[in-house]
Amino acid sequence: MSVLAPDAVEGLFDQIAPIYDNLNDQLSFGLHRLWKRMAVKWSAAKPGDRVLDLCCGSGDLAFLLAKVVGSKGQVIGFDRSQALLSVAGDRARQLASALVIDWQRGDALDLPFPDDHFDAATLGYGLRNVPDIPTVLRQLQRVLKPGARAAILDMHRPYSPLLRQFQQVYLDRWVVPAAAAQNCAAEYEYIDASLEAFPQGQQQVALAIAAGFQRAKHYELAAGLMGVLVVEA
């Protein structure tokens, strides 16, 4: 569960939208792009599919999905932050490609899509920021077709005490100072508290099964600093 109210989370991401992509590259040394490609692969999206990128942010996963589903498929990028959706739309226009993505603003707690609608879905760095994780998982399960997969990528607190210490030093001495240089220190200080409140891998699996998914498996990435929850409706 997010440690901030929904409007506060929306305001936070609206604030960091202009620097979001550059700072993500800097803070992850570009590795977030590799992890996102892995998430798209785990989603099992294929040409011609109708797919959802929930909490799409500036659109990285949506662009990757659009390349997979091709001109006969459909991608919806869905987010609460209008500022990030504007960044995503600007990026799409700059690419000037044949990729067609429908950007929609709304609430992940109440998705405006019919049941059994999507062939696959992704959710990158968003589940940690929602106010009610079980409700979002139930909504995601509802809109996926039976047998469809979703891949949910996010940061995690690792189980290892040594790695937890490393993560804390990384956040305190690298992430927040780098954000401070962009006048966004307060926004990135929020990451620490959000990680403390975020369920770890096996807890996420249990939540997914309780939400109605038939199968769920959590994969650790980067020694447990990141992870992907793969679920099947």
From Swiss-Prot:
The catalytic activity, as recorded, is:
demethylphylloquinol + S-adenosyl-L-methionine = phylloquinol + S-adenosyl-L-homocysteine + H(+)
EC class = transferase
The protein's GO terms of the molecular function aspect are: 2-phytyl-1,4-naphthoquinone methyltransferase activity
Q: What pathway is this protein said to act in by its record?
A: Cofactor biosynthesis; phylloquinone biosynthesis
The entry's keywords: Methyltransferase, S-adenosyl-L-methionine, Transferase
The UniProt record lists the EC number as 2.1.1.329
Going by the entry's taxonomy, the superkingdom of the source organism is recorded as Bacteria
Give the family this protein belongs to, as stated in its UniProt record: Belongs to the class I-like SAM-binding methyltransferase superfamily. MenG/UbiE family.
The free-text function statement in the UniProt record for this protein reads: Methyltransferase required for the conversion of 2-phytyl-1,4-beta-naphthoquinol to phylloquinol.
**Identification of the protein by name:** 2-phytyl-1,4-naphtoquinone methyltransferase
Which species does the entry assign this protein to? Synechococcus elongatus (strain ATCC 33912 / PCC 7942 / FACHB-805)
The protein's gene is named menG
